[in-house]
Amino acid sequence: MSLDIVILAAGQGTRMRSALPKVLHPVAGNSMLGHVIHSARQLSPNGIHVVIGHGADAVREQLAADDLNFVMQDKQLGTGHAVAQALPALTAETVLILYGDVPLIEVETLTRLLKLVNPQQLGLLTVTLDDPTGYGRIVRDQQNRVCAIVEHKDANDVQKAITEGNTGILAVPAKRLADWLGRLSNNNAQGEYYLTDVIAMAVNDGLIVATEQPYGAMEVQGANDRKQLSELERHYQLREARRLMAGGVTLRDPARFDVRGEVSVGRDVLIDINVILEGKVVIEDNVVIGPNCVIKDSTLRKGVIVKANSHIEGAILGEGSDAGPFARLRPGSVLGAKAHVGNFVELKNANLGEGAKVGHLTYLGDAEVGARTNIGAGTITCNYDGANKHKTTLGTDVFIGSNNSLVAPVDIFDGATTAAGSTITQNVPTEQLGVARARQRNIEGWKRPVKIRKD
């Protein structure tokens, strides 16, 4: 079965009280529309057609991709009118209609819905709610067959008592859709062309309206204001927390843990409170992450320990290595197996060999550090001359004394040592001691200044 997907994303979202288009408001680090597009892609459709209107330029700019066809709805005249704008681009046998502000819809739910569709049957996703206020009501006949959907504003008291609501998510035979959309009327309380009226037309044309339900109501919850947006955020985070715990991860407090990207986590991993995982993060078995850490676009190999208050971005931490507390690893940083980065250490585009140690209060930028090398406290690489970046290379078994400035480009070869307080501007040969500091003088008879009294 070939498939086209239409995503309705033209709404203004006035209740958000924001200049940002509603569908671009983020849930878990990705826009609501971005979540929907991600789910749509997993269905392998012929095309994904995004109907845009308010803030169209911003939507295009943020989400532009080769597999997306943006369709403009100049006037917002209802959901039926919105789908009609995409009709000329539809070529598949089945059309699935989704909504850009319903970000938590599961691929499994959509797959079940699509299985209902055939030339004589369409699929409708409904949800049963204790309070369906605001939802269109699913009207069924005496044989429990769907015969119509009545919007909440147009419903009478009997219809408002119905607890089965319309989610708006619909899968239909494409050959029928153009005819039904062409017959829509705006004779209703809103003066709009409702997509829901397609259901009654399908029934009148002899088609069966088969229904499917999501695993939970939050899966089809939209966000019209900031409160609803926060509810979606919290539901998503708890869902991700449960998924990780089911896979063998210990979370000290699932309510104080955030995922904002694609995360792969191994078994026997311990994650403390207030940890944020952003972007693409891979965490292997037996990793420990302390409290208040941010891990972004990074890989943590087996047995890594990240201590409290560390920020790691674009880095690879080798097996058995550790970082923190208060460590910052910037993009391009690599820790070899069993390497150690201590408190208040910043790395940027630095590669530490196996067993290398950078204990504290250090900055290494654009540096290559060999195995088992030890770098003393207060050391910095002077890698930028105001115009260009330069590299510092330290061999294996090097010992850098405390409070060193390594002025790049410079090489310190295997087994070399630098004295504390040195400013190293020249290469240090293998197993030699580099000393670059002024000789100390002790001045006899020196008097400490005294404070001048002011009368």
Swiss-Prot record:
It comes from the Bacteria. It holds the Pfam family NTP_transf_3. Pathway: Nucleotide-sugar biosynthesis; UDP-N-acetyl-alpha-D-glucosamine biosynthesis; N-acetyl-alpha-D-glucosamine 1-phosphate from alpha-D-glucosamine 6-phosphate (route II): step 2/2; Nucleotide-sugar biosynthesis; UDP-N-acetyl-alpha-D-glucosamine biosynthesis; UDP-N-acetyl-alpha-D-glucosamine from N-acetyl-alpha-D-glucosamine 1-phosphate: step 1/1; Bacterial outer membrane biogenesis; LPS lipid A biosynthesis. Its EC number is 2.7.7.23, 2.3.1.157. Disulfide bonds: none annotated. Residues 248-455 are annotated as: N-acetyltransferase. One of its GO terms (cellular component) is membrane. Keywords: Acyltransferase, Cell shape, Cell wall biogenesis/degradation, Cytoplasm, Magnesium, Metal-binding, Multifunctional enzyme, Nucleotidyltransferase, Peptidoglycan synthesis, Repeat, Transferase. GO terms for molecular function: glucosamine-1-phosphate N-acetyltransferase activity; magnesium ion binding; UDP-N-acetylglucosamine diphosphorylase activity. Its cofactor is Mg(2+). Residues 1-226 are annotated as: Pyrophosphorylase. Residues 227-247 are annotated as: Linker. InterPro entries: Bifunctional_GlmU, GlmU-like, GlmU_C_LbH, Hexapep, MobA-like_NTP_Trfase, Nucleotide-diphossugar_trans, Trimer_LpxA-like_sf. It is found in: Cytoplasm. Transmembrane segments: none annotated. GO terms for biological process: cell morphogenesis; cell wall organization; lipid A biosynthetic process; peptidoglycan biosynthetic process; regulation of cell shape; UDP-N-acetylglucosamine biosynthetic process. Acetyl-CoA binds at residues 377, 383-384, 402, 420, 437. UDP-N-acetyl-alpha-D-glucosamine binds at residues 8-11, 22, 73, 78-79, 99-101, 136, 151, 166, 224, 330, 348, 363, 374. NCBIfam families: glmU. PANTHER family: BIFUNCTIONAL PROTEIN GLMU, NUCLEOTIDYL TRANSFERASE. Catalyzes the last two sequential reactions in the de novo biosynthetic pathway for UDP-N-acetylglucosamine (UDP-GlcNAc). The C-terminal domain catalyzes the transfer of acetyl group from acetyl coenzyme A to glucosamine-1-phosphate (GlcN-1-P) to produce N-acetylglucosamine-1-phosphate (GlcNAc-1-P), which is converted into UDP-GlcNAc by the transfer of uridine 5-monophosphate (from uridine 5-triphosphate), a reaction catalyzed by the N-terminal domain. In the N-terminal section; belongs to the N-acetylglucosamine-1-phosphate uridyltransferase family. This is Bifunctional protein GlmU. It comes from Pseudomonas savastanoi pv. phaseolicola (strain 1448A / Race 6). The lineage of its organism: Bacteria, Pseudomonadati, Pseudomonadota, Gammaproteobacteria, Pseudomonadales.
